[in-house]
Structure formats: structure tokens, C-alpha cells
Regions:
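Membrane-embedded transport module
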Residues: 1-122
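Hydrophobic alpha-helical transmembrane segments in multi-pass integral membrane proteins
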Residues: 58-71, 141-157
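Extracellular/periplasmic helix-loop-helix junctions in multi-pass membrane proteins
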Residues: 150-170
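Membrane-interface capping segments at transmembrane-helix boundaries
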Residues: 119-122, 183-199
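Interfacial loop-to-helix junctions that mark the boundaries of transmembrane helices
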Residues: 10, 91-98, 129-130, 161-168
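Small-residue-rich segments of transmembrane alpha-helices in multi-pass membrane proteins
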Residues: 49-57, 133-143
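Cytoplasmic-side transmembrane-helix entry/capping segments in multi-pass membrane proteins
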Residues: 45-46, 126-136, 197
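Alpha-helical membrane-embedded segments
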Residues: 110, 168-186
Length: 205
């Protein structure tokens, strides 16, 4: 949803970085690290309801707030105080920094999924069984460091990202923490399965 709403909250270059860090690299390494042996199986519907939909719906809804919330408070006074030409010049910079805030949120959320895929401790159990495998968690930490390095170097301009102000960074980080606890609650309580009347799998954790 972040690709298709309003004034394009995230552009292609920003989206490519988000996808690389949260999908491209993790998918390859998780496939390499996959352990042979018994894995419980769920139908596609069960898997969508339990894992995919809660994470994506919450990320989409909170992401809308991450982008449009600050945008509203920044643009409202600018409309009243600036001429049309000044407003257009200001608008470009405001959009870019809010796109960067949303990109940060999506990266953090995507990386927070990795410990849930292979829970290293009981706290992370919700989307899958306890595995005790710390490699995906350390991968998330490493990719988070890569993202920080991008934001602190000229690579930031290559991906069309703006430096985040402290309020923007705090808002994006706080929103990611909100997503973390809400999605964990949704997984553990199986809220979507209950809403749609789907019985839990006997093989589920």
C-alpha cells in the first residue's frame, strides 16, 4: 500500500533499498540456513491469516500515519504563510523527508520480522515455533547497521533519502515499536483467524 497512495509516499529508489534490506538479502540467507526435517504445514489461507495479513495490514495502517501525520502538521501552516511559489519549493523538501521517515519505518518493521520467522527466545514466539536460532536476529541487526551506514554516507543521495530530523526518527522508531507489540498480540491471540472463523491448525505452535 505504501507504493500507491496519495502523493507516492515512497519512490522507486527508496523502495529498492527497503526491498533489498527486508526481502532480497533475508530471503537468500534464510533459504541457505533452512534446516531439513519436519516442518508443520498450513494451508495458504491459514498462513495468510496468521502471518502475512496481520503484519502487512498493521504496517500499512501505521505507515499511513508515519507519512501523512507529520505531513499534515508541516503543510498546514505553510499553506497559510507562503506564496504559491514558496509553497511549491517547500513542498518538495517536506515530501522527501517524510518519504525518508516512512522508508525508515518500513526497514525497521521488515527487519523486526526476522526474529519472528525464527524465534530465538520465547518472547518472539507468535508467528512460528521457538527455534533458538539467533542467525536471523543477528542478520536483522547487521542489515540495520547497513541502513544506518547508508543514511550517514553519500549513498543516501543515491537512494533519494533525506537526513532524518530527531523528531522524524523518533516518530518512525516509535511507530515501529507500536507495530511490534500489536503484531505480536495479533499473532498470539490469532485475532484474524478468530474474526474469520478459521480453526487453528493442530500443527501450529
Amino acid at each position: 500500500s505504501a507504493w500507491s497512495i496519495g502523493v507516492f509516499p515512497i519512490d522507486v529508489r527508496q523502495g529498492s533499498l527497503v526491498t533489498l534490506l527486508t526481502v532480497g538479502i533475508p530471503v537468500i540467507l534464510l533459504a541457505i540456513w533452512a534446516r531439513p526435517g519436519y516442518r508443520y504445514h498450513q494451508t495458504l489461507v491459514r498462513r495468510l491469516l496468521h502471518f502475512v495479513l496481520p503484519a502487512s495490514i498493521l504496517a500499512s495502517l501505521i505507515g499511513l500515519g508515519v507519512f501523512y501525520g507529520p505531513l499534515f502538521f508541516q503543510l498546514t501552516p505553510a499553506v497559510k504563510a507562503l506564496s504559491a511559489e514558496e509553497f511549491l519549493a517547500e513542498f518538495v523538501g517536506i515530501i522527501r523527508i517524510n518519504q525518508s521517515g516512512l522508508s525508515a519505518f518500513l526497514v525497521v518493521v521488515g527487519l523486526l520480522l526476522l526474529p519472528f520467522v525464527e524465534p530465538p527466545t520465547a518472547w518472539w514466539v507468535g508467528a512460528d515455533r521457538l527455534s533458538g536460532d539467533w542467525r536471523p536476529t543477528w542478520l536483522a541487526v547487521g542489515l540495520g547497521c547497513v541502513y544506518i551506514a547508508v543514511m550517514l554516507t553519500p549513498l543516501r543521495d543515491f537512494f533519494d533519502l533525506a537526513p532524518l530530523t530527531l523528531p522524524h526518527a523518533a516518530f518512525a522508531g516509535g511507530s515501529a515499536l507500536l507495530w511490534l507489540f500489536l503484531v505480536r498480540l495479533a499473532w498470539r491471540r490469532r485475532l484474524l483467524e478468530r474474526f474469520f472463523g478459521v480453526e487453528p491448525s493442530t500443527d501450529a505452535q
